[in-house]
Each structure stands twice: as structure tokens, then as C-alpha cells.
Amino acid sequence: MSNFSITVIGAGAYGTALAVSFSKKNRKVFLWGRNKKHMQSLKKDRCNKKFLPKINFPNDLKIEISLKKAIKYSNTIVIAVPSIGFKNILIKIQPFLNKNVFLICGTKGLEPRTGRLLQEVVYDILGRETCLSIISGPSFARYLAIGLPTSMVLANNCIKTCKFLANKLKNKFLNIYSISDLVGVQIGGVIKNVIAIASGMSDGIQMGPNAKTAIITYGLEEMYKLGKVMGANEYTFMGMSGVGDLVLTCTDDESRNRKFGILLAQGYSIENAKSKVGCIIEGYNNIKEILILSCKHKINMPIIKQVYKILYMHQPVKKSILNIFLNKK
């Protein structure tokens, strides 16, 4: 396909970073966001001052104010919006989608209230004939946008299509592996955010590196157990979208979910912690839905349960973190 073109839907930190990275190789990359004032600022400044300050846009990255034009321009649509707004975005873009479009989901989360995987939301709204891929992996926005080496995973049921898209999206700083396990990639991207909250809490009450490493390891086990019963390939969790994303999100200072956990452990209220982080915290948004899945599939997930008790039952942080270890004995 010589006329390859990409539109990224979502002009937050992650969507902007993906668009910047993709435009280092592709000449037709468009970025659209729902806030018109924000998009006009991006167009004027050639930089996302709010979410990724001091990172200038490549010349080949076009800022598009019109959703209709942004969708019609492209044969590849990448959705990078918070999970809470994912369904509404699909409904909005549906009338404008080109036939045989490649749809790539960069959102890490579950459908609110139901706990459904986002692939099921896509198939419900756009049909099961949709050529859907999932992109995930350890890829914090700032590092990706400035061109630091990054490895990600792209999943598609058709491995030939997956390899084609991965080749189009990757560049000398971004490597993208191709796999066919959509379920495993999604589960990894969801669970790691809650584990990162627990990791941050452990750091916030100074439990030490031994405890944090144990939480990460236990978290990988919970990810594996839920993924396996939902039909994922166990080897997916040993890769970039599993242990790779988990380790980064649990240990790096750029992690919103980890910051949120640290602040809660330091005594901040949930609302004040959310405000101080200043961005969407997917682990907080999705924990109820993860519990729905664990109950449905009869999977014991001690970390998920204990973080839930902190967030919704006002259980003290230290008690919950210690309970994680007690439940593992």
C-alpha cells in the first residue's frame, strides 16, 4: 500500500506521542482530539504544551480540527483515548470510516460497568469484520515522543496483516513485534495499572525494594491466571505487553498509577491524589471491572482485592499491603 496514512484519535500525552513517533517515518499522519481549543493550541504552537511540553511536532504531523476529515483522510485509525470514552469515540467515528480501514486500539482498559474487553466493544459497534489490532507495551509518552528506544507489541488475528502494519508503524527508535493474541495483550495492559498502584503504595509507606519486587511478581501471576482462563496465550505475559509493561509502570517515576499509589500512601484523599497526578488513572477507573472478571471466572486476585478495599472500603494502606503477603502464604 503506497498511500498509507494514519490518524491518531486522542490528543493527550499518549496519543500525541504515538502521532509524533509514527510521523518520523510516515508522511501522512494526522492527530485529532475532542477539545477544539486544545487542538487549536496544538496547531498554533506545533507542540502539546499541556501534556508533552518542549517536544516539537515533526513537519509531517498534521493537526486536524474536523473529525470527519481526520477519519476520511486515513486508511489506518489509531484510538488512544481513556477507556471511559472509548465507546463514544467509536460511535462518533463510525459514519466516517473508510471501507477496509485498519483500526488500531491503543487504549488500555475495560468497558466501564461491564468489564468487557475493548475488542468486544469494537465488534459490537463496528462489526466483527473490522480489521482490529491492539498496540501495547512499555511506552511512556515522553520517552516515546523524544525518540528513546522503545519496543511494543501489535496484535491482530491475521499475522500477515499484523506484520504489514508493524512494519509501517515502526522506525529506528520504535520496534514493534507482531503476535495474534489480542486477549493477552489487552489483559496485560489492564492489570498492570492496578499492580502499579499497589507498587506505589508500597513505596509510599517505605516497605522497601523486596516488597515491591514481590508485588510485581505476584501481579504477574494474577495477570497470567486471569488471562489464561479468558483464552490468552501464556507466553504473551512474558513479553512486552505483559512483564515489560508491568515492570515499567510499577517502577518508573513517569507512571501515573504508581504516583497515585504513592500519594494515597502519604495520606492524600482519592480526589486530591487524582488532582495532583493531573491525568486519567486507568487503574483506578478499571478496578471494579477487573473484580467483575475475577468473580466471573472464579480467579483469586489478592492484589486487586486489596487495592479495591483501599479505594472503595477505606481500608488503611499498610494493612492492605501486608494482607497481600498474608494471602500468598
From Swiss-Prot:
InterPro entries: 6-PGluconate_DH-like_C_sf, 6PGD_dom2, G3P_DH_NAD-dep, G3P_DH_NAD-dep_C, G3P_DH_NAD-dep_N, NAD(P)-bd_dom_sf. It is found in: Cytoplasm. Pathway: Membrane lipid metabolism; glycerophospholipid metabolism. Keywords: Cytoplasm, Lipid biosynthesis, Lipid metabolism, NAD, NADP, Nucleotide-binding, Oxidoreductase, Phospholipid biosynthesis, Phospholipid metabolism. The keyword Isomerase does not apply. PROSITE patterns: NAD_G3PDH. The active site is at K192. Its EC number is 1.1.1.94. GO terms for biological process: carbohydrate metabolic process; glycerol-3-phosphate biosynthetic process; glycerol-3-phosphate catabolic process; glycerophospholipid biosynthetic process. The keyword GTP-binding does not apply. Catalyzes the reduction of the glycolytic intermediate dihydroxyacetone phosphate (DHAP) to sn-glycerol 3-phosphate (G3P), the key precursor for phospholipid synthesis. This is Glycerol-3-phosphate dehydrogenase [NAD(P)+]. It comes from Wigglesworthia glossinidia brevipalpis. The gene is gpsA.
